[in-house]
């Protein structure tokens, strides 16, 4: 067995990176469809070159892959820059079989935007996301761990914040009302 590898720069490695992200996740992190798939989509859409991920430039790549067909038409979700999404509470608690069902394209694209939001846009730092991830890894239920992301906000308030932050970045998400 060899000890070297070569990456063909002419090929898109996003699916491989997506699947490797799943392999590196704890089984507990996989209980939340949106988080599991969002994190994998986030990594798969982040530029990778020379053995490094470029997180500083990934927002434009993620937006392009979610709203269009990706930079250089390398593949994307093509949701457009204005789309309706499920109610946030329902989405964050969606069973995996439903997540990957008839609206899978929307669910995966939204998951990438949600991951980016919690990694870069939420609050003044990453405490909410870190606390959520620690809770999940320690065996806390998804519903309980979500309280750490909500941090006193209702799902409707969080949905509005996500909509506002993404609108400033050129993507208009419209979460359905949960009632």
Where on the chain are the PLM-derived regions?
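Juxtacatalytic substrate-recognition/specificity segment
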Residues: 1-32, 36, 49, 142-145
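Acidic/His/Gly-enriched intrinsically disordered linker/tail segments
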Residues: 30-179
């Amino acid at each position: 067995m060899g000890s070297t590898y070569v990456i063909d720069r002419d090929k898109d490695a996003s699916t491989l990176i997506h699947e490797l992200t799943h392999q590196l996740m704890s089984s507990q992190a996989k209980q939340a469809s949106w988080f599991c798939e969002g994190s994998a989509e986030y990594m798969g859409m982040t530029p990778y070159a020379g053995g490094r991920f470029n997180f500083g430039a990934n927002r434009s790549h993620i937006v392009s892959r979610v709203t269009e067909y990706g930079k250089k038409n390398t593949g994307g979700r093509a949701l457009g820059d204005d789309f309706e999404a499920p109610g946030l509470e329902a989405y964050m608690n969606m069973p995996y079989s439903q997540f990957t069902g008839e609206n899978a394209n929307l669910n995966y694209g939204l998951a990438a935007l949600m991951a980016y939001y919690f990694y870069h846009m939420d609050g003044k730092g990453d405490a909410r996301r870190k606390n959520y991830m620690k809770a999940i890894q320690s065996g806390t239920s998804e519903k309980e761990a979500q309280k750490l992301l909500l941090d006193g906000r209702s799902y409707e308030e969080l949905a509005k914040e996500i909509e506002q932050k993404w609108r400033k970045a050129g993507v208009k998400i419209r979460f359905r009302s949960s009632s």
